[in-house]
Amino acid sequence: ASDEDREGEAIAWHLYEVLKLKPENTKRIVFHEITKSAILKAIEQPRDIDINLVNAQQARRILDRIVGFELSPVLWRKVKPALSAGRLQSVAVRLIVEREREIHAFKSEAAYRVTAVFLVPDTDGKLVEMKAELAHRIKTKKEAEAFLNACKGANFAIEDITTRPLKKTPPAPFTTSTLQQEAARKLGYTVAQTMMIAQRLYESGFITYMRTDSVNLSEFATIGSKDAIIKMMGERYVHPRHFETKTKGAQEAHEAIRPTYMENQSIEGTAQEKKLYDLIWKRTIASQMADAELEKTTVTISISSSSEVFTAIGEVIKFDGFLRVYRESYDDENEQEDESNLLPPLKKGQKLEHGPIVATERFTQRPPRYTEASLVRKLEELGIGRPSTYAPTISTIQNREYVEKGNKDGEERMFNVLTLKDQQVKDENHTEITGTEKAKLFPTDTGTVVNDFLTEYFPDILDYNFTASVEKEFDEIAEGEVKWTSILKTFYDQFHPSVENTLAIKTEHKVGERILGEEPETGKPVSVKIGRFGPMAQIGTAEDEEKPRFAQMKKGQSIETITLEEVLELFKLPRTLGEYEGKTVSVGIGRFGPYVLHNKVYVSLPKTMDPMEITLEEAEQLILEKRTKEAERHIRVQ
């Protein structure tokens, strides 16, 4: 009675083999929820072990082992020891490396967004503000100034009003992927955390099996949802519906992730378990609720002195439907629909009085770095991996230090604002912080170098279509359409010679090494590369009479972007700051970042301090702070 998926089927088969069971008295039962009724029903419907599912799992496991066992030694020889490669993890790293390069190559373009405030009488005759925006952006400051000047003394009138009904349909119940994404966005859980909590909920009998790519709900679940909706909100909110699974190569016909009993709106458990259960319950209930009914009004405002038009949009919820229970979140704020406010009463031809008209310089946005949730979504879109592989893949690439999850401080940027008020155009410059990122996935230098090496020598393994087509072949094995051994043989016969050829290639420079120039004083070559403890800089070569000098790179510096000047700065460390308590105080950079060294004690530098600029007084303060902390720790222990 192991889990109802390929891994579960393989476990059942291994038990059958190891225990030497007989086919005539061994039956397999499956259920996707741990409830009395589900288990009794499964016992009434036993079946044999599905050898096709077992073979599909064997094929995946063996193919992934072949890739790992064959590629990892190549990386040890060509890049650095102790590295590993894997079919899914390498493709995930490639996505992150490519996105990083897109970001660095991105050139932001400026344009002016023009907004206006119009003063309109409401039903009581009181003037209220109505915000409107120019239908398109203006490219240059000169054109924006010309437009605002044209608005001086112009007449504004309502040219057209269109009102149309809108419907919003609820999202489908959760699959593994959508649960991981929504739990990250709404609850801040990592992908691995979500799966761990969901596993506990499943084992406690609160939810159905949590590794699934199906959006189907059983009849039992739809009836349970209907009853719960009627009881809580009334008949009008019910709309039973069936969702189609759209995922590429969706696996066996599981059910979506849902509560086992829809009448249980809450459960006993930890705070995290309660939050995740609440999310699953709301999503499931919402999927069986009526559409939200809205009314969208678009008002077009003409300008007597220009062919341009302003547009004001109002959206009113006429019937909340599923929105009463659930609103879906988005990775990118731009994906969210603009929920505008209610517009005042208006009529075609109505003359309008304007308040300030503002042209604000805005910039095109670079592609965002992946979060764990958006990476899962991308892998699913490409048909790479399966519900059981998303979380382990994302954990592996971080554990291997090919990718790190981190925050990025924003940068200050100046932007221009032109304001037409009281027939005068005011020109001002403002500053804003842009590009702040939290919990995003960044490629490390090691990840980038490994990715480039594998992309050059093993393009098939890193190819998105190839990886997705392998998943399709596993599906065909599961359906009994192809032999698993023939797929493995075909793959190995093509893959193994590539490994042999790559090992035989001799290269002049170490993989990932970048020559930046020469040291001015000695003329020796200056390079950066991946060393045993990560990215490092080097002056000189092993062939020189004098040993080469090495320096650890600072956190935030990258092999791809570091300059010769920045590398030469690194060799000014360690530097002596002076003496404290009769002992030398120096500052340097080690494998864990910048440090102060005093009397054989290392003190890490805070992120805000630059090792090139720290003073002796500041270093003394850090030494004293560390001593105080150590003393407090010893007191607490005693």
Language model region names:
Residues 1-165, 255-308, 314-318, 474, ...:
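Phosphate-backbone binding and catalysis cores of DNA-processing enzymes
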Residues 72, 105, 144, 191-192, ...:
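Basic, low-complexity terminal or inter-domain segments flanking catalytic cores
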Residues 138-173, 347-353, 360, 465, ...:
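Metal- or metallocofactor-binding catalytic centers and their adjacent structured scaffolds
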